[in-house]
Amino acid sequence: WFHFTGITPALGENVLEICKEACQIAKKKGIKISCDVNYRSKLWSKDAAREAMTALSEYIDMIIVNEEDAKTVFGIAADKTDVNTGKLNKEGYEEVAKKIMEQFHFSEVAITLRESKSASDNDWSGLLYDGKECLFSKVYPVHIVDRIGGGDSFAAGLIYSFLRGDNSR
């Protein structure tokens, strides 16, 4: 399994090329490739991120995004959702996953969903779409001590589950 995040190619043009080369090698060897888009505006512009992620998409099997990355990088937003107020429309994200799949032909699209209750309390869940079925996780109420690493934990759990041979459910 080869996993990278959108932070990696944002670190410089040479790093983008190295990332592309690593993806090409992994693809040739039949290694599954996943990417957590993880857009960071301090590292690159929306347009640069969109261009790079589009170029890398031909190698990626599983894409992982959050609601903001889907909109910012891929230009695909869920109806009846407002990230700033924490309002979330789960069914709208099923449509987001389908649109991302249609546009880029990934084998799986995973989306982390965060419904903000307050600055320190969120409901977290995720979805996985495989082109046939969209599965939603249980909703987990989370008291946030530090936001860093939530998406990484989600990606690690998905990869672990796939490597163990667990089915999507």
Q: What is the predicted function of each stretch?
A:
Residues 1-134, 140-141, 166-167:
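Ribokinase/PfkB-type carbohydrate-kinase core domain
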Residues 135-169:
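Conserved post-catalytic alpha-helical subdomain immediately downstream of the catalytic base
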